[in-house]
Amino acid sequence: MNLEEYNVMFQNDSSNVKPMKGFEIICGSMVNQVRDLFGRNALLSILFQIGAGPGDAIAKKIKKSYKREDFSVLEAVAILLNDLRDYYSISVKKIEEDDDKIRLLIENHCFLRKPIKHRKDMKFGSAICRVNKGYFESAFKSLLGNKIKKTEIKFLFNDEVKNACIEEINFYKNNVIQPESSSIL
């Protein structure tokens, strides 16, 4: 058999290559291997940090673009989500505020949804979603500074009908009164 005949047996035009399918397999394998080798806590920490780096980077980009360091919670949410339209389709369904926190109820269709949907060993709201948690919590921490003590994103449930995860974002207020800056005359 010559090389041409041999190559015909498995020839595949490059337009038929499915990179997302390969990514889904590698991503699922990575999550399972890290969990099996190092444990669940290490996996969650690693995935959070994978998201935190880009979260810090997008916050820095936003601050530079707006030439500001200070944003309100709802302003930061709107700016960040607008900047991330290529990766997320998020809709805010409810906003609640009390003395201690601001709570947003959201529908989130993210870039991880399709890979998770095709993997039997992955579920919505599972470990891989820590990438998003790290991303958003780090970005908001940078954009909101001292106004917020902590930001926490919680997966509530997967809504198959809406093809989105239902989540809440809690912004815990820093109720410590910040001293006004004084100027030396």
Regions found by a protein language model. Give the residues of each.
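N-terminal accessory segment detector
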Residues: 1-103, 108-130, 148-185
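Active-site helix/loop of acyl-thioester processing domains in fatty-acid/polyketide metabolism
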Residues: 125-145
